[in-house]
């Protein structure tokens, strides 16, 4: 490709409304342009990267035995009503009526459509197992699209769905998809971690997320320092206390705390050990008999809302009680709540169950109890794992301690079981002629999100530093003063032809531009390898090669340059 016949569209200045580095660099490098909130057009450079990501995804899915299909982006609402997600999904599901007043949605995912397809096309166990995938545009009407294509409303996704009659083949396909996703990210040269994850709105039993590691990642990953164990912070298991509860050494006493509205203020004003305090959070209950439930964690711990949402007594989705409701039920507001004398179900974190002589709100405004002890001042409450893990704690496998990293979720695999097939009556006849509900798996990769995640992991102060496999071009040719030197023009043109003939993606900057502008553009768009041609190089019979990632420069003889560059890509 020649720059003179290409839409390069680079920008010197960082756009003011671009929050994260990938959004900034995708705009500056001329990869995308915003059409509306969360909607982007891909310019040639961006599309080249997107297509390379897509190609790797497709190759690995095919290797894993999945079969490509294509389903419509527009889906009939009847299917969503059938599974119950028409009411459950919320405003992210964009709904509309056609000219005949029939309800439709823009698909954020395709479980309903694929299940409907399979129940009509597959009738016998002999046709199973089956794993079908597509690479298709999705739409989620995000309340606040941000970070460019990282969290846009319209995005490109690979979604696969597998169908089984038995758990063994479902597990086999799950493992095959796990390996395929690992292969995809490895081939792209990205540092990543597969982590145990919550199944979220899709549902199901087993779930893993695949995260590209980046300091800007929205997700916190808890991983073991001594094994491969890793989990999203929402899913990471807190260790059970190994120590016994200490004996009571303090009397229960009521203390005035007018200026202590938070745990931090309480600790600072009264010189308390934060591990001797608890936080009491009131949420809505799941039953009429218990409309409110108290959740209690240690003062230095954070409530894990995903874990709390799964408690039988807690209404789902989790909803914190408003202050007016709390005051009406307890007589005090947030900041003064605690377990002593509380007339509602109480669920404490396991770490709270071994506490003694601790402080908590007294359920009176501006008052706390100090010296609280279980089984003396109140019955020991029901305990569960309801908190986030903390760095340094032992991991569940016993092979290390927790460390933390930030990641960007780019893939998610689920074992759905019969979540969708049962509600949609997707069945086949088994070998005995008996009707069986299909087991399902679901496997998604954010194709367009990978592009942004790769940039978040690979950039410097000059621009993007693409991994070789997904760079828009592999080699950039920079002829110095090409339009003033016939020798430079001839050598540059010949090199361009030779590299193109060798199957190398090459960009020849044949513009009448200053060398500084040409170098800056090549570095901004992140081309891994550049070859500089000038009269001095020609006199010496060498090209000047520069590696974008390392900055290394070296002279390469004319007759060796093609093999040299091909070897770098091997």
UniProtKB/Swiss-Prot annotation:
Might you name a Gene Ontology BP term for this protein? Answer: prolyl-tRNA aminoacylation
Q: What is its main location?
A: cytoplasm
Q: Which UniProt keywords apply?
A: Aminoacyl-tRNA synthetase, ATP-binding, Cytoplasm, Ligase, Nucleotide-binding, Protein biosynthesis
> Do you know which PROSITE patterns this protein is assigned to?
AA_TRNA_LIGASE_II
Specify whether Nucleotide-binding is a keyword of the entry: yes
Residue ranges spanning the membrane: these are none
Listed InterPro entries: aa-tRNA-synt_IIb, aa-tRNA-synth_II, aa-tRNA-synth_II/BPL/LPL, Anticodon-bd, Anticodon-bd_dom_sf, Pro-tRNA-ligase_IIa, Pro-tRNA-synth_IIa_bac-type, Pro-tRNA-Synthase_IIa_type1
Instruction: State the CDD domains in the record.
Output: ProRS-INS, ProRS_anticodon_short, ProRS_core_prok
- One MF term in the entry's GO annotations: proline-tRNA ligase activity
The EC designation for this entry is: 6.1.1.15
Domain description: Consists of three domains: the N-terminal catalytic domain, the editing domain and the C-terminal anticodon-binding domain.
Family, as annotated: Belongs to the class-II aminoacyl-tRNA synthetase family. ProS type 1 subfamily.
- Subunit structure of this chain's protein: Homodimer.
The protein here is known as: Proline--tRNA ligase
Provide the species name: Shewanella sp. (strain MR-4)
Quick one: which gene encodes this? Answer: proS
């Amino acid at each position: 490709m020649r720059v003179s016949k290409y839409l390069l569209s680079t920008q010197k200045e960082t756009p003011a409304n671009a929050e994260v580095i990938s959004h900034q660099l995708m705009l500056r490098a001329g990869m995308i342009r915003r059409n509306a909130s969360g909607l982007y057009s891909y310019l040639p450079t961006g599309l080249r990267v997107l297509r390379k990501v897509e190609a790797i995804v497709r190759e690995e899915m095919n290797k894993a035995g999945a079969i490509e299909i294509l389903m419509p982006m527009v889906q009939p609402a009847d299917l969503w009503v059938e599974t119950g997600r028409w009411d459950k999904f919320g405003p992210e599901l964009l709904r509309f009526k056609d000219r005949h007043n029939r309800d439709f949605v823009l698909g954020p995912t395709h479980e309903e459509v694929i299940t409907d397809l399979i129940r009509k096309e597959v009738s016998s166990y002999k046709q199973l197992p089956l794993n079908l995938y597509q690479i298709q545009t999705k739409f989620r009407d995000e309340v606040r699209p941000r970070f460019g294509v990282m969290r846009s409303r319209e995005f490109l996704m690979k979604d696969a769905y597998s169908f089984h009659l038995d758990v063994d083949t479902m597990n086999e396909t799950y493992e095959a998809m796990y390996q395929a996703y690992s292969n995809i990210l490895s081939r792209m040269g990205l540092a990543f971690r597969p982590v145990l994850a919550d199944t979220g709105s899709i549902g199901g039993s087993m779930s893993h997320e695949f995260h590209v590691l980046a300091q800007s990642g929205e997700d916190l990953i808890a991983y073991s320092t001594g094994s491969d164990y890793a989990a999203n912070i929402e899913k990471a298991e807190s260790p059970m206390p190994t120590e016994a509860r200490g004996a009571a050494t303090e009397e229960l006493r009521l203390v005035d705390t007018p200026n202590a509205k938070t745990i931090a203020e309480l600790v600072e004003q009264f010189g308390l050990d934060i591990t001797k305090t608890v936080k009491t959070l009131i949420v809505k209950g799941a039953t009429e008999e218990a409309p409110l439930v108290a959740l209690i964690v240690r003062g230095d711990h954070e409530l894990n809302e995903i874990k709390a949402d799964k408690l039988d007594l807690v209404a789902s989705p989790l909803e914190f009680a408003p202050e007016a409701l709390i005051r009406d039920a307890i007589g005090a507001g947030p900041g003064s709540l605690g377990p002593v004398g509380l007339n509602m179900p109480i669920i404490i974190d396991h770490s709270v169950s071994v506490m003694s002589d601790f402080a908590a709100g007294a359920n009176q405004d501006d008052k706390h109890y100090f010296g609280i002890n279980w089984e003396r001042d109140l019955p020991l409450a029901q305990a569960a794992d309801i908190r986030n893990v903390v760095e340094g704690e032992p991991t569940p496998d016993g092979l290390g301690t927790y460390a933390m990293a930030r990641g960007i979720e780019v893939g998610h695999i689920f074992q759905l079981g019969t979540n969708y097939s049962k509600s949609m009556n997707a069945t086949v006849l088994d070998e005995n002629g008996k009707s069986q509900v299909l087991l399902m798996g679901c496997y998604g990769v954010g194709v367009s999100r990978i592009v942004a995640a790769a940039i978040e992991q690979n950039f410097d102060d000059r621009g993007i530093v693409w991994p070789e496999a997904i760079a828009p071009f592999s080699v950039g040719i920079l002829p110095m003063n090409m339009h003033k030197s016939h020798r430079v023009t001839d050598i540059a043109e010949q090199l361009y032809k030779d590299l193109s003939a060798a199957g190398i993606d090459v960009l020849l900057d044949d513009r009448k531009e200053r060398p500084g502008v040409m170098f800056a553009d090549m570095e901004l768009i992140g081309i891994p390898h550049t070859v500089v041609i000038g009269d001095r190089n020609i006199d010496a019979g060498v090209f000047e090669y520069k590696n974008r990632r390392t900055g290394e420069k070296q002279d390469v003889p004319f007759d060796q340059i093609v093999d040299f560059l091909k070897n770098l890509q091997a």
